[in-house]
Amino acid sequence: MNRAELKLEAKNQLRHNWGWAISIGFVMTLFVGFFFARPVVNGSLKTVNSVNDVMGTGSIDSLFKPAFWAGQFGPDTGLTIIGNFFMLSMVVTFLHFARGERLSFFKGIFSAFTDGRFVPEFLNYLCGYIFQFLWSLLLVIPGLIKSYSYAMTPYIVNDLVESGQEVHATTAITASRQLMNGHKWELFVLNLSFIGWYLLSVLTLGIGYIWLVPYEQTTKANFYRRLAGDRYLKK
């Protein structure tokens, strides 16, 4: 798959739609940042403190006790889940946009929560997270590979729901794994091609993200469209 063509297609689609794309992408990014900020900071501090306690006692066995890992989760977990759903809304909204449909501002922001998507998106997201975590216990690389295997899950859930098909907890995960067979490297390289844009965004104190988010999301939606076509839109 030619990534230059995917990016060019995204630029052409955004040419007369930057106002809509920037506004909806900016607001969703704010929501994601808001819901992720506290859990990330608190979670990091909690983990560091827990590990310090373990090292202080000299008992590494504590790392393998359920109580240790249970302590890493709390109220912030709910905020993380909500933040992830706004990320899923971003995926759904720009998939519709890549297909020529501009969702209204509010419908776009909450697209993962509406039209019957919430439960299947949540179940497949949760199962995908668990599977990826279990693979990561082996080594970092297997977990990374699985993250690319499951990368098309939210797109597939959207299409299955829109076509009226029944979506179980692992339906889209399995479909994504099959769809990405032989294409994980292509998506990895596509992601790498945005590194320059991310560096520029950091150097501009985040201003560059205003353009990067719609550009990247539209490009990835086109990647999915090229890969899946209307396969999951058919009953």
Regions found by a protein language model. Name each.
Residues 1-235:
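Hydrophobic alpha-helical membrane segments
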